Every structure is written in C-alpha cells, then in structure tokens.
Amino acid sequence: MSALPAMPRQSLQRFPSLVHQRSVPAQPQELPQKTHYRIHLIRDRSVRDHNQQKNIKELSKEETAIYRNSLKKNICIEMLRKGYHKSFSEVFTVIQRWNALRDAAGPGSAIWHQKPLEEQQEILDQLQHFLTRAEAAQRAGYYEDVYKNQLALAQYFQELDDRWLSYHFFECCFQTATKIKSDGGRKEAEAHENLGLAEEEHGQLEKSAEHYEAFYHLTVGRIWKDETGRSHNSLACENLWRIYTLQSDKMLENRECQQAIKTLIKAFDMAREGDNKKLEGEAAYRLGLAHISSGNPQMAITYLNTYMEISKMLEDNVSLGKAYKAMAKALESQGKILESVEYLENFIKIAKLNNLSRSLIETYSCLGDIFNTRGNYEKACQYFSEAYETALSLSDLALIEETQVQYSISKAHKMMLTVSRLTDTADYASIGHLLAWKMNRSDIFSDPAKPELTSMKDTEDGGKSNVIMESSDDPENETSAELVATS
C-alpha cells in the first residue's frame, strides 16, 4: 500500500497580512470596553440565578408524602389528623370487606373486573366527606344528621348499582334510626322500607317481607308522606302486595296451592286497604287462577267477577279480556261449555274494537281448543283458522308457526271423521275412495261439492246421503291432512 506524499508546510511568511495582524498591538481605548462588557455578563447571570432560587418552592415532608403515598393512605392520614377515628375505621373496614368479597367471587365474576375500591378517587372522596360529617354530627348528638349522611352514601352507591355497599349503608341508617326518638319512628319506618327493597333486589323474599311488615305497622294511622306526596301507609300496602304476590308465585311453582291462596288473600287485603283498585283487581285475578288450579272453580268465579267489575270501572279492556278468559276456563272446568264460549266470544268483540291482536289470537286458540277437545272439529277449524290469519297480519314467525300447527291438527281431526267412517263402512265404494285419496294426498274430504268421489255423510234426520268429492293434483290444495296419513 503506497503512502500519500507529505504535505509541504507553508510558512506564515507567505501570508504577510496574517503576520501583520498578529504584530499589531491592541488599542488602549478598547480594553476598558471589553472588560466592562465581561463584567456586565457576569453580573446578569448572578441576578438570574438569584431570581430562580427565589421562585423555587421547597416542599414540606407532608406535601412530599402526598405524592409518594397511595390515595387510600392519604385519605386515611387526613381523617386521622383531623380526629375522625371512626370514619377511618369505617373506610378501612369497607375496603377490606370489599376486597374479601372480590376474592371470594374469583376471576370471571363481575366484581373481579371492577377497579379496586382503594383506587377509585371519587368513591373515596364521597366516603371521606359523608362519614366525617356523620361522625361530627354523632359527637354533637344530632342523629338526624347522622342518618341523612349515611342515607346519602347508601343512595349514592345505589345509583352506581353497587348493591353490597348500598345495603351496608342502609343497615347503618337503620341502626341510627332506632336512636332517633323525636320523629315518632318515621326514620325507622323509612329504614325498614329501604332494607326491604334491598332484600327484595337480592331475592330474599322472606327477609324483605319482614321489613315491609315492620314498615306497615309503623305507618298505620300516620299521615307521613314522601317527596312525591304519597302516604307512607299506601306505600307499605303496595310493597306488601308485591312481596306477597312474588311469594305466592313461588308457592304455585312448587304446587303449594293452599299456601299460595292464603298468601294471595293477604295481598288482596293489602291492595284493598291501600285503596289501589288496579292492584286489588290483579290480586283477585290471581286468586281466581289459584282456585282454578286447586280445583275450586266456584270460588274462582267469585274472585273473577270482582276482577271483571274493577276492570269495567277502570275501563281497562286488556284486563277485562283476561277476566273473560279466566272465567271461561273456570266455567269449562264445571262443564258449562256454552257459558264459557259466550265469555270468550264477548272478549273477541272487545279485542277487535281495541286492536288487541295478540289477545285475539289467544282467544281464538282457546275457543279452538274447547271445540277440538269436545270433538266439534268444524268449529275448531274455524277458530284456529282465524288465529292463523290474525298471526299472519303480525308477521311474528313464532306465532305464525304455532297457530299453523294448531290449524293443521284441527283440519286433520276434521278429516279423520270421514276417514274413520269410510273405514268402518268397508264396502267397495268406501275402499275405492280411501285408495284414491292415498294416491293423490289432497284434501278430498273437506269439500263435499267435488265430483268423482262419493262418501257417506250423516244427515240431520239420522239417515245417510252420498256426498260427491273430487281429488286434485294441485299441490296448493294439499293440507296438513298428510300429517295423519300412513303409507
């Protein structure tokens, strides 16, 4: 590898201008100016550093700890510094119990995916605010204020749909309400109602009923009213009606009819005492159905008559239709078919006037069932056909399929009358008719005006007459009679 030739060093003598500049002495008048300029720069920097030091704020140990500690720790320390030891214990206990509840639920549960309570600043702020105020009021002996602050927390968590925390503070409200003697027990009554609602949401019907009954007894003879102007006693009656109704539903599911009837009677009495006609009618309707299930149609008719009267008074056509249907069922169980059909046909008129299409379908189907069970397949086909046509107008596929099956079964039953008659006759003509039908699989028995095939039909005077029928190859004429055909 060859090296590059060395660069010749050039002397400064070849650049006289540079040499001349280096040999020129500095001007005397410029020295003070440069020195003064340098001093000026140093002086400015010292002033700037001094101002920066003045603007820097030193943090105290407490302020530094705020940034270092967790949110929960800061709130707890603040409450302890201000002397709210009970509030500190309450917050700490609530967080511990919430975490234990979360761990018990395990991964995959709804609470497991929630943000930990100690990391939710808004909730901790609300706890600190209302608990400290409640503690201060308790020290002063103002239990009404303690109750208000605890109730505010319970309602706050209720809005967040946190049932556990809302129930916890509703319990605290109840404990505080028992210490308030100046209001005649009003706060205690309200606390019972709140606990009853909370227990009902948890599905604890027995405990809920106990609180509602206590609420009712505390409000008897009182003129207390809530924010909407409703009396507490009417609210207690409504709550008891609802909880008794829920209890009776479970009893009926377990086929405890007599116990359910006793519970429904209590619901009926509560609705009547609360002067709520709609609830009274609903309780009477349920009592009627329960008596039908227990095999006592006469008592059912008594309550159903009450339901009909209330429905007419309230001009509630939907409820009136329910009453007619239930009454028809009770009369049918007594063997009074004509009266049963009359009630159902009355409801059909009401349903048509009020465009109650779904109720109309149910009634048509009910009438179809009655006639189908009694062997009047002609009438059954007529009503099931009406149900099917009405279902088509609603474009409800599930309902269409259900009514279609009912209509098909009734037509098959109707057709089987002729099939059975021809089979029993067993003569040459009858066998020929049956064979022709098996070859064509058309609805040859439904229309007596068709030629080619004849069958024997009963006349009104008990004799026999030949009915001519025709088979058809058109697939559109095929009906559900194929459901009962055998190959």
UniProtKB/Swiss-Prot annotation:
The TPR repeats extend over 92-131, 136-173, 189-222, 241-274, 281-314, 321-354, 361-394
Q: Where in the cell is it found?
A: Cytoplasm, Cytoskeleton, Flagellum axoneme
Cite the entry's keywords alphabetically. Cell projection, Cilium, Cytoplasm, Cytoskeleton, Flagellum, Repeat, TPR repeat
Q: Name one GO biological process term.
A: cilium movement
The yes or no answer to whether the keyword Cytoplasm is present is yes
GO terms under cellular component: cytoplasm; cytoskeleton; sperm flagellum
> Out of the domains of life, which is the source?
Eukaryota
Q: Name one Pfam family in it.
A: TPR_8
Stretches the record annotates as Disordered: 447-487
SMART domains in UniProt: TPR (SM00028)
* InterPro entries, per database record: Bac_ResReg_Asp_Phosphatase, TPR-like_helical_dom_sf, TPR_rpt
Q: What is known of its domains?
A: The TPR repeats are required for axonemal localization and flagellar beating.
Summary of the function given for this chain in its UniProt record: Axonemal protein which is implicated in axonemal and/or peri-axonemal structure assembly and regulates flagellum assembly and beating and therefore sperm motility.
Q: What is this protein called?
A: Tetratricopeptide repeat protein 29
